Amino acid sequence: VSESALIAELSPVRLLGKATGMIGVFTGLGQMIFLPLGLFMADSLGYASTYITAGLIGFLGFAMCLRIPKIKVTLAEDNDEEVNIIRVPTWKLVAVPALALTTFSMSYGAISSFLSPAMQELDAARGASLAGIMLSIVGGAAMIFRYFAGVVADRTGAPGSLYIPSQIMAIIGVGTISLTLFMESSIWWLVLGAVLFGGAFGIAQNEALLSMFDRLPRERVSEASAIWNIFYDSGTGLGSTLLGAMVAGYGYDGAFGAGVAILIAGLLLTTADFILGRTRVSETNDIRTRLRRMRKV
């Protein structure tokens, strides 16, 4: 939560897309390197070695935090002008990008939990060798495309412009996984589906965060970051649980098919938001809120 809010405070607005994209690059790179390294250390040196190493890395992070430059944080000022401004509830401003992100993270919860065993069930020989690196493939694609989304946002000055294309890309990716498992096709189609979804998920992560930063004033970037993390993590947990429950009754293909349906629901949500964008609520002095206030008076 704090890193995203800090990046928003440190970075100039014209570079905010790349800055948030770099969060994904370093997070993804760290996972790609240290997840397999941790498994190797646990097998060869024992689990204690992994916890000790993680603790030492934590101290390194603490030392780096001491080098963060001091900044003047933007705060909401309680003056007469602020009192007279009619504000819109936060949830109205961030509901669409947050819920759309949840549809992605729900599908990611299913992919991270069940894609590897599904691959082994489809092709025991090649599935066993590929299953161990599938999360790295998804994470690598997400890392690259998240930074790409940040570059596009900085150049166009329009955060959220790639949200709908990323949803279509994710639907194709998860749909490919579901259809491959249903038809028992080549396992390489699963790899393609994972790459497509990973790339789409990376774009969606950055677009959701930038959209929230864009819709909320600068003094509320901490709220935007917290909301982003809440919906991301809750979606991952819901996806693992709800779609996992479907595996028992409908198989892996049915669970991923349900993931496609969830992504389609998110696409309809963002499409409606895009069409109604001209009348979308703003952070202050929204017409609908003004009329409602006048009726009460």
Language-model features and meaning:
Residues 1-25:
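Cytoplasmic helix-loop-helix junction between adjacent transmembrane helices
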Residues 113-129:
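Short amphipathic helix-loop junctions that connect adjacent transmembrane helices
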Residues 70-97, 287-297:
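Juxtamembrane intracellular "pre-TM" segments in multi-pass secondary transporters
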